[in-house]
């Protein structure tokens, strides 16, 4: 019992339960807890950019093999594209079989379209050239100041290559970045001590602001989406994991604390630093983890992909805006591009969805007002699926590139999650 009370897992679970209770008993007070959740997520986002930079630079400069770095990046992108496409198709397939919006006969004119317009205005269809140009930061500091993960990743790759080319003169800089990285991970450990407070505030706000009642009116869509995410995790990712020699069940058990943090905060970014440390502790090489995990937050959002296809077709069904098979394939193609711009932040999936429907024009954007009230509750499943998908991706790509210690992977997964006493060694 003493061991349980000293674990982060236990206290985050307690905090989530207390947040739910407060949101139900005193909704206005629960809604007022929002700053606690927002503050915790901002603390995490504060250290994401330097951790990604240090991890990637140390990984690239330490390998001495630039061809391997390029191969890792190429294989990661190939994996992301294939698995993201599978998740989009799975969402499209199940929403057409279950048809959660059929028979609702919603008149879009009766909905509050103004509530959706704010989201639609935030997103727009980017061309490939615009996307690539936006990956390049205006200045070295600008990428860190804005917290743009892809920009920081690009800087880190270039910096690591340049440092590796310096030869013997690189040692001083390498050692400095190594020590700085240790400080950043120690800072993450400090921030994680307040994770239960952040989870409590975020959950209390969600229940207090949106209410449990909003779940029942669209229960069929919610149930269909959650079941689809579970199917993806245990069937698709489970099959991928089994093929590559590890159990998805043991993997989920190993990262259970990170999953609870994501569940409580509804943001996959909240677990990014710890996920990078955990994947290294499972035997994946630092350079692989440093490339795959951050890139996955833009290119491998499996939960968001499932949500996008299901929500778009649900709105079409509910508003009687029939979509032909060809139009659904068009939707799929557009979402393959649009989903790459969805960051791992709460609400980003809804913004991308609104922008996609605006670009296609077949489904009324105002129909999204139907799911605006439950989007926050669906965000948890999106974020959890995203985190699990990126974790599996890092192990798979590490194995493909020969950068995985399979003995360590098997041993760590068998022994289960690290104890509180083992945490400092893993996080360093």
Swiss-Prot record:
Compartments reported by the entry: Cell inner membrane
Keywords on this record? Answer: Cell inner membrane, Cell membrane, Membrane, Symport, Transmembrane, Transmembrane helix, Transport
The processes (GO biological process) annotated in the record are: L-aspartate transmembrane transport
Which SUPFAM superfamilies does the record associate with it?
Proton glutamate symport protein
What membrane topology does the UniProt entry give?
Answer: Multi-pass membrane protein
One GO molecular-function annotation for this sequence?
succinate transmembrane transporter activity
Question: Could you give one GO CC term from the UniProt record?
Answer: plasma membrane
Membrane-spanning ranges: 7-27, 40-60, 75-95, 143-163, 196-216, 221-241, 306-326, 329-349, 351-371
Q: Does the keyword Transport apply?
A: yes
InterPro entries referenced in this protein's UniProt entry, alphabetically: C4_dicarb_transport, Na-dicarboxylate_symporter, Na-dicarboxylate_symporter_CS, Na:dicarbo_symporter_sf
> NCBIfam families from the xrefs?
PRK01663.1, PRK13027.1
- Tell me which family the UniProt entry assigns to this protein: Belongs to the dicarboxylate/amino acid:cation symporter (DAACS) (TC 2.A.23) family.
Purpose: Responsible for the transport of dicarboxylates such as succinate, fumarate, and malate from the periplasm across the membrane.
Report what the protein is called. C4-dicarboxylate transport protein
Organism classification:
Bacteria, Pseudomonadati, Acidobacteriota, Terriglobia, Bryobacterales
> What is the gene called?
dctA
């Amino acid at each position: 019992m003493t061991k349980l009370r000293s674990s982060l897992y236990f206290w985050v679970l307690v905090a989530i339960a207390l947040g739910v209770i407060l949101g139900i008993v005193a909704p206005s007070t629960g809604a007022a807890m929002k700053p606690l959740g927002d503050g915790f997520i901002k603390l995490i986002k504060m250290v994401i950019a330097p951790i990604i930079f240090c991890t990637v630079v140390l990984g690239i400069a330490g390998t001495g093999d630039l061809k391997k770095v390029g191969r890792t990046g190429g294989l990661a992108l190939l994996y992301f594209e294939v698995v993201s496409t599978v998740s989009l198709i799975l969402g499209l397939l199940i929403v057409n079989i279950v048809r959660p919006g059929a028979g609702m006969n919603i008149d879009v004119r009766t909905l509050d379209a103004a509530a959706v317009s704010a989201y639609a205005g935030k997103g727009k269809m980017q061309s490939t050239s615009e996307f690539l140009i936006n990956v390049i930061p205006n200045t070295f500091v600008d990428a860190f100041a804005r917290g743009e993960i892809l920009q920081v990743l690009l800087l880190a790759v270039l910096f690591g290559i340049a440092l590796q080319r310096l030869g013997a003169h690189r040692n001083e800089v390498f050692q400095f970045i190594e020590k700085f990285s240790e400080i950043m991970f120690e800072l993450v450990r400090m921030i994680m001590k307040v994770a239960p407070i952040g989870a409590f505030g975020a959950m209390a706000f969600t229940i207090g602001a949106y209410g449990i009642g909003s779940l029942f009116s669209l229960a069929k869509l919610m149930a269909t989406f959650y079941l689809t995410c579970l199917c993806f995790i245990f069937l698709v990712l489970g099959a991928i994991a089994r093929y590559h020699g590890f159990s998805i069940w043991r993997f989920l058990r190993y990262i259970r604390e990170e999953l609870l943090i994501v569940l409580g905060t509804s943001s996959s970014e909240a677990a990014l630093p710890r996920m990078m440390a955990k994947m290294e502790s499972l035997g994946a090489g630092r350079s692989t983890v440093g490339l795959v995990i951050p890139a996955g937050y833009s290119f491998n959002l499996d939960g968001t992909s499932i949500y996008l296809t299901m929500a778009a077709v649900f709105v079409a069904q509910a508003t009687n805006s029939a979509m032909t098979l060809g139009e659904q394939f068009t939707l799929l193609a557009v979402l393959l591009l649009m989903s790459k711009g969805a960051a791992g932040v709460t609400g980003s999936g809804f913004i991308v969805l609104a922008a996609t429907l605006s670009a296609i024009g077949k489904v009324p954007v105002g129909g999204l007002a139907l799911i605006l009230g439950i989007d926050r509750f669906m965000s948890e499943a999106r974020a959890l699926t995203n985190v699990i998908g990126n974790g599996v991706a890092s192990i798979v790509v590490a194995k493909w590139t020969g950068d995985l210690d399979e003995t360590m992977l098997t041993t760590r997964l068998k022994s289960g999650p690290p104890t509180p006493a083992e945490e400092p060694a893993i996080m360093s």
